[in-house]
Amino acid sequence: MGKKLVKEKIAAYHDFRDLILDSNVDIVHIATPPHWHGIMSVEAAKAGKDIWCEKPMTRTIGEGKRVMEAVQQYGRMFRLNTWFRFTDQFYGLGTPVKPLKKLVQSGL
């Protein structure tokens, strides 16, 4: 159905490796279950793709280090999606950020 909506001008992939090997793709957005984030990020960097990844970056510190090593080795950009970090509401939970900041700065 999605293909009909865009008149057959987008590609559908059943395997992420096919997507990252596509020369028409410049950047990948990783929005999969967290256990895939590290694997996909490393492979995307190796394939020369810049990466936009949803939280959490990886499941472990070791996986995160491997991602950063791959990003540096292959000269790619990595961006972790951190929406609502700088808005009036903290992560959309209805908690104002400024009172929290004052509380932290007060030393409590």
Question: Where do the model's predicted regions map?
Answer:
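N-terminal glycine-/serine-/threonine-rich beta1-alpha1-beta2 phosphate-ribose binding loop
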Residues: M1-C53, G62-M77
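A contiguous active-site-proximal alpha/beta segment in oxidoreductase catalytic domains
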Residues: D50-E54, T58-L108
